[in-house]
Structures are given as C-alpha cells and as structure tokens.
Amino acid sequence: STVLLFSSILLMLKNNLNNEINESFTSMIIMSALLLKSGAAPFHFWFPNMMEGLTWMNALVLMTWQKIAPLMLISYLNIKYLLLISVILSVIIGAIGGLNQTSLRKLMAFSSINHLGWMLSSLMISESIWLIYFFFYSFLSFVLTFMFNIFKLFHLNQLFSWFVNSKILKFTLFMNFLSLGGLPPFLGFLPKWLVIQQLTLCNQYFLLLLMMMSTLITLFFYLRICYSAFMMNYFENNWIMKMNMISSNTNMYLIMTFFSIFGLFMISLFYFMF
C-alpha cells in the first residue's frame, strides 16, 4: 500500500517536476504494487503463509473479495508486458507450488495463484471476460471453503478418514475439486473455455499452451488427492468433528455442489433454448 501511494504521488507531481519523472516507470511501480496486493507471482511470497494462518472464511475473503480492487485498477493500467510476465509466472508457480502440499489452505492458496494467472490473462483481452471468470472462481472457492469450514478440515490426511461412511459427501467434495481445476464437463470449465477462445482469436498460442499445461498439473494433484482418499484405509482421527449428516449446512453444500457439477449443462441448455 505504501508503494502504491508513493508511486501515485509521484505520478501526480509529474507535471510540477518538469517531466523529470518517467511516467511509464511510475506506472510500472503502481502495477507491481497492485500485483503484490492481489498475490500474483512473482510477488506471491506472502500469500500462502498468510492463508495458512487464517480461518476458512477469512481465507475465502482473501482469495476472492480482496482481489477485486487491485484487479480493477490493473485493468485501467494494462501494462501488457508486465501482465504477460505475471501471467506466465503465476500459472507456473501456482501449479508447481501445489504439488507437494499437505495443507489444504496452502493448496487453495497456490490454486488461487494459478487462477489469478488466468484472470490476469483475461484482463489483457476483455474486462467482461475477467469478471465472468472471477464470478465462477469465487463461487467454486466458496463451495469448497464452506465445506472445509463445516467439518474443520485443514490437512490432507483428514480427508483420508473424513466420513468414511459418507461416500456421497466425499464424492461431491472431489467433484468440486475437479470443477475448480477446470475439468469438463463441470462448471469450472466454462470460464477457462471463454479465456481459451479469446486467446486463440488473439493468436496467443504460446501463452495458451503454458496455461493449459499448468492446468493439467493442477488437475494432477487434485486427482491424486481424490485417488488417495478413496483408496486409503480408514483410521481414527481424534480431531474430526462428528456432525449430523442431515443439517442445513450440509443441505446447502449439496445444493451448491449440484450447480458446480451440472451448471455447465444448465447454462448450455438455457443458451440453446433462448
């Protein structure tokens, strides 16, 4: 915030200093400060550690709501070469950083960095595209963090024994993981599909290749979590909170999961009907 304010003051004083201040350099400092506030690479160093110390609801705010203002300001600056560097680093670091994580909050943090790379790439194309992407990403993140918050899940080994007799909840949780990763035909594929179409029209094939490869890596560690949790034998965890399966929170989660899994079909049907 200090860097952002300082560079803004420099930009305002530019005319009073006989143009001795380079405007593009000042804009680059402002852009770097905004990327730092949003948690984009290479200014992401604070984001996973901050996520690890937050509750799930506060982590959700950090992953979604706190990104709106920086991204809106970035869309007005739109320094393409700096955005391009941040997009490439964000999708790569977000994918590779989540490979060996055992903490669910850090896993979601690196997933957020990867998705932020997709949102920044959509900023280079159209403001409406990134708003659509941000809306779907926020919804899918809310579904997962809502469930993690209900059952107090913070580490992967808790998933292995989590509600061993409730295969439905386990199955829906992992379907939401795959939807967040952008696997078709789930809802999370729709915003990625829009970005892929627009990047193809702009002939950004190399950038698109890197982004799709990073998505495959994120899907790999999501699938690894799913496979391990379904194949591991049951063992007792004293910190697992027992809950009544027929509760309002669980019912709300199942309703949101329905839209997460079948939302793409419903949107496609609505589009072809009207």
Curated annotation (Swiss-Prot):
Residue ranges crossing the lipid bilayer per the database entry: 28-48, 54-74, 79-99, 107-127, 128-148, 171-191, 206-226, 254-274
Gene Ontology biological-process entries: mitochondrial electron transport, NADH to ubiquinone
Naturally occurring in which organism (per UniProt): Drosophila mauritiana (Fruit fly)
Transmembrane helix among keywords: yes
EC number: 7.1.1.2
Keywords: Electron transport, Membrane, Mitochondrion, Mitochondrion inner membrane, NAD, Respiratory chain, Translocase, Transmembrane, Transmembrane helix, Transport, Ubiquinone
Described purpose of this protein according to its UniProt entry: Core subunit of the mitochondrial membrane respiratory chain NADH dehydrogenase (Complex I) that is believed to belong to the minimal assembly required for catalysis. Complex I functions in the transfer of electrons from NADH to the respiratory chain. The immediate electron acceptor for the enzyme is believed to be ubiquinone.
GO (cellular component) term, any one: mitochondrial inner membrane
Subcellular location: Mitochondrion inner membrane
Gene: mt:ND2
A family per Pfam: Proton_antipo_M
Name of this chain's protein: NADH-ubiquinone oxidoreductase chain 2
Molecular function GO terms recorded: NADH dehydrogenase (ubiquinone) activity
Primary localisation category: mitochondrion
Reactions catalysed, as given in the entry: a ubiquinone + NADH + 5 H(+)(in) = a ubiquinol + NAD(+) + 4 H(+)(out)
Family (UniProt): Belongs to the complex I subunit 2 family.
